[in-house]
Amino acid sequence: MNSNPLRALSYKDWAKSSTENSMYDLGFDIKPIKNLVISGQMNYKRYEYKTKNYTATHSAINHFETGNPIPGTESTSPNSMSMHWISNSTMLTTLTAKYDMNFGKHTINLLAGTSYEHYNYERLYSKRTDFVSDGLEDIEQGNEVSKETPGGNSIVESKMLSYFGRVNYSYNDRYLLEVNVRADGSSRFYKNNRWGVFPSVSAGWRISEESFMKSIKWVNNMKLRASYGTLGNINNVGYYDYFQLLSSSANYNFSDTAVKGVLEAQIPNTSLGWEKVALTDIGFDLDIFNNKLSLSADYYIKKTSDILLGYNVPKETGIWSNPSLNLAEVQNKGFEMAITHRNQIGDFSYSISANIATNNNKITNLAGSDNMIQNAGDNVRWILKEGESIGSFYGLKTDGLYTQEEIDAGRYYIYGRHPKAGDLKYVPQREGVKYYCDLEKGEPEVNASITDDDRTIIGKDVPDFTYGINISLQWKNWELSAFGQGVSGTNVGFESEQVFAFMLNSNPRKYHLQRWNEENPNPNAAVPRLYGGTSLDEYNKHFSDNQLFDSDYFHIKTLSLGYMVPRNVVTKWGLSSLKFFLTGENLFTLRADKIMKDFDPESSTGRGISALGTKSIAFGVNLSF
């Protein structure tokens, strides 16, 4: 009744808010001498948000028959007003000097510069109650005694200063060399670890420019290239991770009386440093047959070191949160290739491009921590393990569903409770686990129990390879284009709502019709039996490969058909161009697992899995005068 819209209109509640965005850009270019250009730029962005809310007291609703107040429909809290203010700003300034030199067949380009970035965030929140009138908009008119600051106030500030330089060298556009170096200093680190230096070098050889290639007319371009470079990353570093933080949100009991105290919530971490990325790449480019066929291929090795991980601190220290330390290393290596064929035959022209990329992801160092379990939701589990991929799912393996005959014969394992027909058949990974019926007299049931120690790696969400295709066809004034992409060798873990029908008021899915039931006791059914959501009947809720699905797919992202009206026609209508087009998005998807058809194959694991992107067809007209 309190949500009746007509009653809500009679309330004296109100809310006011305002948002302000501003952006400024300034820049200059100076050429003091020949071939020298000095450039400067400043970019400033500011965002401010203000909101003020007032909640009045509400009387009880009167019963429409008796006229008496209905208990529980009146407001039980005093009137109140809250104010919330957020402001953040970013300023980025750069200054560069560029000098170009040419002598003979030699070309040299020099660049040196510096940049400075300043980020500031502020937040204020205030609340007061017991206003003498609902018409007041001044928060100072509230009761001073009841002044509150829930959520508190916060200030965040971050600064980064960088110096960088680059040298490009080319000999006769045949031999190419580039050397880069940059030094970055961030306020997110302690002063002794604030700076990181990141060099890179790349070289190229245009083989097609050599004299011995001149006789091979069908080769337009052939280039061999190699590079090695390093970068620094602070995206995983908090603004104040190296600080010692104290918290007053602690009480201690003295003589049966709770006394407010202060504890060390975060220990100082002065050794915190940059995450480092080192990338080695060898590539080959080829254009042949008057550029009708193009090929580009790369082999890469990417090593990320000093990755931040939470280090477990003994509970006896009283430290709330585990400090982040530069502990882990990860390696990615793979092959990328793209090929394009283009041609024109009379009024018909076409371009077809395809690409494929493989990636082998492996954790090479966890600083002695062999497995670190992480949650991807209420139920989904990942594990970090040396020698395995990031995004490895950690759970129980299954082998179909129990039949009634297996239950009656005791050929099952216990997992907190005894299973029933239609429950998942978990497979133990430890040696010596027995069926319930094989227990000897007096032997504890635990010897027939599945435990968390039976969990193992059951899949991963990092694909083995990705691929895509782009097609463009033109005939006279007509054009047709299509773009599709796909992945292979990956899984997605569904959260409880997607797997179990009706859980947390979720809707059942069509694949739940394939469940095990007494009329269809299929031990290979895709979904186990339905059961009530009680703790005594949740044998199937544990994360297992039954909640993992093959998320390989090929997806037609866009398909477009267009027609350009001839220019000699549109000029008679006072137009310079006129084009009609019909475009479809998310029209077609091939999936390895049919159960996935209700979900977006590009979604990530966990509760964030979303429904399939909406199919859309749009007709439009582009015209210009």
PLM ranges: what are they?
Residues 6-53, 80-102, 109, 117, ...:
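Outer-membrane beta-barrel transmembrane strands
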